[in-house]
């Protein structure tokens, strides 16, 4: 029987504690309500100097100053380049100079008589060799630029 009184007394204490906390939560604030914490100041900003962009350049840029119209990797090192004669007049004139851009292939260097294309490439290169002072290979006359 004593156990029953202890259970009832424990329940009454639990209800009283619950009621006490419930009343405290619903109570209106007093004359000096608590103020919220002030915001924390921002940390000091460090002004870092801007980094210069890093540009990736090919390693052989300095050694290929003559090669303006194409890369060496685009040619055929075994058979050589095709001997196409550039046009120096009209709309379709090219900036290519065969003396600077064409390369004879390895086969034409080994046996130039057996490969007709190698002889033609060598003739074309030698024909344009005198235009080496003008990098484009064009005749840079005043009429070319539209003035007389």
UniProtKB/Swiss-Prot annotation:
Q: What is this protein called?
A: Uncharacterized protein 020R
Task: Give any Gene Ontology cellular component.
Answer: host cell membrane
Where it sits in the cell: the answer is: Host membrane
Q: Which UniProt keywords apply?
A: Host membrane, Membrane, Transmembrane, Transmembrane helix
Pfam families for the chain: DUF5850 (PF19168)
Entry's transmembrane regions: 1-21
Q: How does it sit in the membrane?
A: Single-pass membrane protein
Q: Where is this region: Disordered?
A: 27-61
Q: Which InterPro entries match?
A: DUF5850
Q: Which organism is it from?
A: Frog virus 3 (isolate Goorha) (FV-3)
């Amino acid at each position: 029987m004593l156990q029953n009184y202890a259970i009832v007394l424990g329940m009454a204490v639990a209800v009283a504690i619950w009621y006490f906390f419930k009343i405290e939560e619903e109570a209106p604030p007093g004359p000096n309500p608590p103020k919220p914490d002030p915001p924390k100041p921002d940390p000091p900003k460090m002004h870092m100097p801007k980094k210069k962009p890093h540009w990736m350049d090919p390693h052989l840029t300095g050694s290929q100053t003559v090669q303006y119209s194409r890369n060496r990797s685009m040619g055929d090192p075994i058979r050589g380049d095709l001997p196409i004669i550039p046009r120096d007049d009209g709309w379709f004139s090219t900036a290519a100079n065969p003396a600077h851009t064409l390369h004879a292939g390895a086969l034409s260097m080994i046996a130039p008589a057996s490969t007709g294309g190698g002889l033609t490439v060598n003739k074309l290169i030698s024909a344009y060799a005198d235009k080496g002072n003008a990098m484009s290979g064009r005749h840079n006359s005043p009429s070319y630029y539209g003035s007389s």
